[in-house]
Amino acid sequence: MIRTLTTFLTSSFLAFPATAHVVLQNMEGHAGYQEYVTIAVPHGCGASPTTQVRVKIPEGIMIVAPEQKAGWVTAIIRRKLAEPTIGEGGAKVTEVIDEVSWSNGNLPIDQLGLFTLLVRTPDTPGRVLFFKTIQKCVAGETKWVDTIPQGEPTWKMWARPAPAPFMVLKKPDAPQLGATMQQILEERSKLGSPSATR
């Protein structure tokens, strides 16, 4: 079962009433799926409101689409791959989105801010994706970048001083679209181009 933000925050505040973390709204996702990744910011830097949220995209994520957030400026930083790879539909990919930021905003310390990405997760069930996040405020910043080695129990993340928001990839029961991309491409080739069917 996917553990939601509400469940986490409830248990977190019961266990640690004086603390809260920047987390993902859903901490589990399917390997090889398009997933919404929502970073939840439940507080500021002490008594200072949040003005920027920067997220480092984990290795292996080839597709990223950040949501435009009203009142904030969304920006992306791209990174060239050491070697080109093949992406969706057989297209050659030479660079990927490395970082996404939302800035020039003002999130009060007592309000919850949600910052969303649509990503294509790697096809690696069991892997933990760490979305290292830097929360900048009017005064100061917090770097939510602490991680654990792959294979370690994820509960150990909560013992870290500033755990990075993370998602555990699980094996899906079926392809997200009901068929593999190869099957879809083969079916598409049978139908031909739109102009050929007129």
What are the roles of these predicted feature ranges?
Residues 32-37, 127-130:
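Short, solvent-exposed loop/turn segments enriched in Ser/Thr/Gly
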Residues 100-127:
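Low-complexity, intrinsically disordered segments enriched in Ser/Thr together with acidic residues
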Residues 80-109:
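Extracellular adhesion/glycan-binding regions together with long Ser/Thr-
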Residues 16-20:
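Sec/Tat signal peptide C-region and signal peptidase I cleavage site
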Residues 136-198:
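Extracytoplasmic/periplasmic copper-protein system
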Residues 34-71:
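Low-complexity, serine/threonine/proline/glycine-rich extracellular segments that form mucin-like
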Residues 126-139:
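Serine/threonine-enriched low-complexity regions used as flexible
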Residues 1-11:
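Sec-dependent signal peptide recognition
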